[in-house]
Amino acid sequence: MAQFTRMETLNAIYEGGIVPVFYNADVEVAKQIVDAITAAGGRIAEFTNRGDFAIEVFAELVKYARDTHPRMIMGIGSVIDAPTAAMYIANGANFVVGPTLNAEAAETCNRRKVPYSPGCGSATEIQQAHELGVEIVKLFPGGQVGGPAFVKAVKGPSPWVSIMPTGGVDATEESITAWIQAGAVALGIGSKLVSKDLVAAGDFDAIRDKVKDCLWWVKKARGESLFVSIEHPGIYPTKDGGGQEVAEWYAQTFGFDMKVGNSTIFISGDGKGRLEIAKEPTADKAHVCVLVHNFEQAVADLEARGIELEEATVKPALKAAYLKAADPAGYRVHLLWNPSVT
């Protein structure tokens, strides 16, 4: 059964705006693709029902994602009928996508509160999908149906329509910007994003980087800021070994979680934002962390304005760099790209 509620899945699709679409008969390769999507900050992945024993690969992939990437929302694509939809839902599909509109498949998904996105190629089919309870309609094949101009035309008289083009969407800033600014709420991208050449070469880092770029281009096209928010302040205790006491006070007083590191302790609650507490009195470590949507773009933006940064710390799922100059109050400031807290 689905791990996430219907609303959780739909909100994640709306928020991220990119649905990577892929198929691979080798479950170990499929796992590495999911790893790459997750490392890029993606929370949605659509595995397609396109090969023999695809259901077995999908079931193993869902189990892997739940254990390794608990925030990853796995769905199934290329579903054309109700029995297939039911089979995949029973094996953990959180959403179902099809190339065509099928009323019985819609009813099956509705019974289990699983989002269904059927392929539609006309305003009439989109209306029929809405009457069947579809929230996000898949425009397929997007390029052949009419491209971004079709989305804009449909949303004129029907601004409430949520359209996810698939087919004809390139993993480029130009293509993504055109679709999003035309009114698409999300984009399904298959071989242009998870390309056969990169998979065959085992270059999953390149897939990760492409997904990361696409996620940023969606946000940029929506007019979202490159700099997200103040992610956390870094404070220090006034006495030796006092960091633990301070952290425990926050945890006990407010019921927050503690994550103990080598030299600092992070405090966090259910919402976004954290507090970093140094274990020892280190005034020079007091700082402010600024969360960014895209690390490379953020660095380039600051440098273009004459703001220098120190050498970056780069890990698969984390990038950070301190500004060389402190803020007017004397606090150090560092950028942070970290999908787990974005």
Report each predicted region and the residues it spans.
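N-terminal beta-strand motif that seeds the catalytic metal site of vicinal oxygen chelate
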Residues: 9-23, 215-247, 285-288, 336-342
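Core segments of cupin and vicinal oxygen chelate
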Residues: 33, 50-52, 234-274
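Vicinal oxygen chelate
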Residues: 202, 208, 224-226, 230-240, 279-342
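Conserved short beta-strand elements that form part of the metal-binding/catalytic scaffold
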Residues: 254-286, 323-339
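Glycine-rich phosphate-binding active-site loops on the catalytic face of alpha/beta enzymes
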Residues: 98-105, 138-147, 183-204
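Conserved N-terminal beta1-alpha1 strand-loop-helix module at the mouth
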Residues: 1-83, 87-91, 181, 201-219, ...
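Catalytic cores of alpha/beta
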Residues: 81-91, 124-132, 170-187
